[in-house]
Amino acid sequence: MKIILGSQSPRRKEILNFFSLPFEQVSPVFDEETVPFGGNPEHYVLSLSAGKTKSLRYQFPKDILISADTIVYKEGKVFGKPRSKEEAFQNLRELAGHWHSVYTGVNVSNENQEIQQFEETKVLFNSLTDDEIHQYQEKIHCADKAGGYMVQGAGSLIIKKLEGCYYNVMGLPINTLRLCLSEIGIDLWKYLKD
């Protein structure tokens, strides 16, 4: 039995590598556009992460699968991964000076059960000029990040305040993952690295 991280995200891999838990990273073949947003961000991220898990279950029928999906959400609007630098610019402009929420759905399953939980983190951006947004975009590859930004590194220049789990904004909330893994008998505490 293997543990499969069903994600192409280097940040999720980085977070899981905080622990000595052996895993393989496999990109799910799943079109996120096929899941409609029904107005509830919690249900939406859970549906997305479940879809990723389902897309891998046939390939790994007896293994433990970990999948996650993250969105940025503000006043009824979902900000996913931007399709262009221009869209990322507009996202950052719209988020600048305002609070928004980052939701991540976590799905952990084995051949017998599926555990799902979500995490919400509230983020307040600094007010940003167009020039500051352009400078930020010159340093950050935005295409694979919900909302077109990241919390780590240069993200500290655009984020004024954060309420909740920092690692949720990176894409994999550690405590939520710990709770899901414990439901299938894996104690993440036993895999702490020195």
Swiss-Prot record:
The record marks R11, T70, Q152 as: Important for substrate specificity. SUPFAM superfamilies: ITPase-like. It is found in: Cytoplasm. The keyword Cytoplasm applies. One of its GO terms (molecular function) is dTTP diphosphatase activity. InterPro entries: ITPase-like_fam (IPR029001), Maf-like (IPR003697). Its EC number is 3.6.1.9. Transmembrane segments: none annotated. Keywords: Cytoplasm, Hydrolase, Nucleotide metabolism. Its cofactor is a divalent metal cation. Belongs to the Maf family. YhdE subfamily. Nucleoside triphosphate pyrophosphatase that hydrolyzes dTTP and UTP. May have a dual role in cell division arrest and in preventing the incorporation of modified nucleotides into cellular nucleic acids. This is dTTP/UTP pyrophosphatase. It comes from Protochlamydia amoebophila (strain UWE25). The lineage of its organism: Bacteria, Pseudomonadati, Chlamydiota, Chlamydiia, Parachlamydiales.
